[in-house]
A protein has these predicted regions:
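Extracytoplasmic
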Residues: 1-149
Length: 149
């Protein structure tokens, strides 16, 4: 039977065009010139919600020590056009047997790398979760990194 079936080529795109005023209901990969990336500047975007949807990064820690944790901030047009609008991203940082909350105030943050905090990580994997809980219309999961102190 398989030899009689036509091979169907997957022509779907990995990235979708999105608009911040009508954000997708599930995490959707998209591109933007202000996202982090060397060749492809991409991120995931979702409509703001109650915090039940998360984007998770798993970061390998090469050796135990103090690390600074950074998130790459992207500010969409919603913040640029409305000066009174406030919004912050809610992160959960899981390492060893700890779970800590971290926040970035998007009104005060600069675009680009913004520090989430300083942590002592053992040589293992750190999980950083960004929730969809936000007062803005959408949440953008761009990039995270750790830098040893």
């Amino acid at each position: 039977l398989p030899k009689w079936l036509d091979k169907v080529e997957d022509t779907s795109f990995k990235y979708s065009g999105i608009s911040w005023w009508r954000a997708p209901l599930q995490w959707t990969a998209t591109t933007n010139a202000k996202y982090y990336g060397k060749y492809i500047r991409s991120a995931y975007v979702i409509k703001s919600g109650d915090g039940s949807q998360t984007a998770t990064w798993k970061i390998p820690v090469p050796e135990a020590g103090q690390y600074e944790l950074y998130y790459h901030v992207f500010k969409d047009d919603e913040l640029r056009w409305n000066d009174r609008l406030q919004g912050e991203y809610h992160f959960r940082v899981a390492y060893d047997s700890e779970m800590e909350d971290a926040y970035i105030n998007l009104r005060k943050a600069n675009e680009g790398w913004e520090q989430l905090g300083t942590y002592y990580f053992s040589a293992d994997t750190v999980r950083v979760m960004l929730t969809d809980e936000c007062k803005l219309r959408s949440v953008t999961a761009d990039a995270v990194k750790i830098v040893k102190r």
